[in-house]
């Protein structure tokens, strides 16, 4: 590191060089979060339900959180999405078309006691899942 009276240019150059040691700077500059994101930077995505899965809650909680494996239509990637609400999983069947969005954990990660689940189901066959859970709407028959 230059320390002299005329060392400004070297200090600037070095600080630009050593920025790449910062993990967050490198991820931001190389756009890695969008590249690795299954939704490709979009707020929501549509997908087809492959199967229903129960995910065990982390300690100290004890529960089986009802989730679904979804294959996204736009790129074929598979993600796990949480079905929010009491009995919500009963409104979701295999091969249904669902809309998912991020679960809202910090830094785009999972939330609460559900490990490895980053998404929530918002609608099933173009009907809001919450509306079906509270009984305001019925699931359309195909």
UniProtKB/Swiss-Prot annotation:
GO cellular component: small ribosomal subunit
InterPro entries (alphabetical): NA-bd_OB-fold, Ribosomal_uS12, Ribosomal_uS12_arc, Ribosomal_uS12_euk/arc
Keyword Transcription regulation: no
Source superkingdom: Archaea
GO molecular function: rRNA binding; structural constituent of ribosome
SUPFAM superfamilies: Nucleic acid-binding proteins
Alphabetized UniProt keyword annotations: Ribonucleoprotein, Ribosomal protein, RNA-binding, rRNA-binding
CDD domains on file: Ribosomal_S23 (cd03367)
Gene Ontology terms: biological process: translation
Self-association and partners: Part of the 30S ribosomal subunit.
HAMAP family: Ribosomal_uS12_A
Functional note: With S4 and S5 plays an important role in translational accuracy. Located at the interface of the 30S and 50S subunits.
Protein family per UniProt: Belongs to the universal ribosomal protein uS12 family.
Protein name: Small ribosomal subunit protein uS12
UniProt organism field: Methanoregula boonei (strain DSM 21154 / JCM 14090 / 6A8)
């Amino acid at each position: 590191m230059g320390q002299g009276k005329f060392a400004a240019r070297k200090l600037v150059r070095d600080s630009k060089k050593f920025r790449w040691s910062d993990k967050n700077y490198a991820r931001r500059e190389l756009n890695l979060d969008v590249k690795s994101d299954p939704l490709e930077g979009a707020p929501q995505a549509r997908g087809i339900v492959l199967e229903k899965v129960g995910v065990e809650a982390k300690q100290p909680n004890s529960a089986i959180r009802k989730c679904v494996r979804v294959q996204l239509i736009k790129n074929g990637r598979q993600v796990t999405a949480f079905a929010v609400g009491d009995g919500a999983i009963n409104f979701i069947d295999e091969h249904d078309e669902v809309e998912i969005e991020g679960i809202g954990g910090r830094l785009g990660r999972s939330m609460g006691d559900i490990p490895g689940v980053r998404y929530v189901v918002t609608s099933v066959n173009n009907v809001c899942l919450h509306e079906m859970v509270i009984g305001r709407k019925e699931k359309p028959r195909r």
